[in-house]
Amino acid sequence: MVQKEVAERAVARDGKESILSIAVKAFGVPRIAAKVPAGAFRPAPKVDSAVLVVDNVSRRHFEHGGGLPKERIKHFFTVVHAGFAHKRKLLARNLEAAASKEKIKNAFDLFEISEKARAEDILAETWIALAEALR
């Protein structure tokens, strides 16, 4: 059980991803199982809660290709953190901390990512593929 707003960010169905939603979706399928109003607790907190469930938990996205899953997971989070490092900057510019401009351009072309894209605009599945392409 987490704050309702945290659960909603983890599920992120509004097309605006976050580091949290991408991290959760890389390992499973999140869903809100129940919402719990603040009044259900004594003393009542100032916020509502939600039961966040992550179905189909696995490392399947990181088990194929070269390298150990642990190394691939570390690289994935390095790329994601670089992408979200400066929220107002374009994604390509942020990713220069994790990969060369040439690799970034090739990956953007491959996945048809706009050069004007920001980190929050990229779906979790694309982040997984993008991180792999930037290895």
List the predicted regions and their residue ranges:
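Class I S-adenosyl-L-methionine
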Residues: 1-119, 129-135
